[in-house]
């Protein structure tokens, strides 16, 4: 069976998703510049404006150690954003080479993040402090 959830805003365009260990779904809302949270058990949805604003175009996203990490692809340079799930606070860092639209991110087995910098012919490793 396929179950679909309609997001709260008709202009939402989720590009990528990340799933936490407790099966909560987070999505990068590319068109509106938001991070969204969907609880598939209850259908509850909550959204936060991305730090880079409505034109930040969140794209690649992953979960690591109690936080959602994603990239804002329309900022120059692209930024890496971290959203702490307990405090609901954001942190951001500029991507040194610019990012070039990070469309995909993954968590490594040793607790770091790998990003595909698709317009720059680069792959980046983000070493996450413990």
Residue ranges and their predicted role:
Residues 1, 39-43, 84-88, 127-130:
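Short loop/turn segments that connect beta-strands within beta-propeller blades
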Residues 3-7, 46-50, 91-95:
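Beta-propeller fold detector
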Residues 9-24, 53-66, 71, 98-110:
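Beta-rich, blade/repeat-based domains predominating
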Residues 10, 31, 41, 54, ...:
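A generic "binding-loop/recognition-motif" signal
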Residues 19, 29, 39, 62-63, ...:
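Residue-level signal for WD-repeat beta-propeller blades
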Residues 25-31, 68-75, 115-119:
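Conserved beta-strand positions in repeat-built beta-propeller and related beta-rich domains
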Residues 34-37, 78-81, 122-125:
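A short loop-to-beta-strand structural motif that recurs across blades of beta-propeller domains
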Residues 99-130:
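Blade-level signature of beta-propeller repeat domains, shared across WD40, Kelch, NHL, RCC1
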């Amino acid at each position: 069976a396929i179950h679909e959830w309609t997001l709260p805003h008709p202009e939402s365009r989720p590009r990528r998703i990340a799933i936490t260990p407790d099966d909560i779904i987070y999505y990068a809302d590319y068109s509106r510049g938001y991070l969204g949270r969907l609880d598939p058990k209850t259908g509850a949805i909550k959204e936060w404006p991305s730090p880079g604003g409505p034109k930040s175009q969140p794209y690649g996203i992953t979960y690591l150690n109690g936080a959602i990490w994603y990239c804002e692809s329309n900022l120059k340079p692209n930024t890496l954003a971290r959203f702490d799930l307990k405090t609901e606070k954001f942190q951001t860092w500029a991507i040194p080479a610019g990012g070039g639209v990070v469309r995909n991110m993954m968590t490594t087995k040793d607790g770091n993040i790998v990003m595909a910098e698709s317009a720059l012919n680069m792959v980046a490793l983000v070493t996450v402090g413990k």
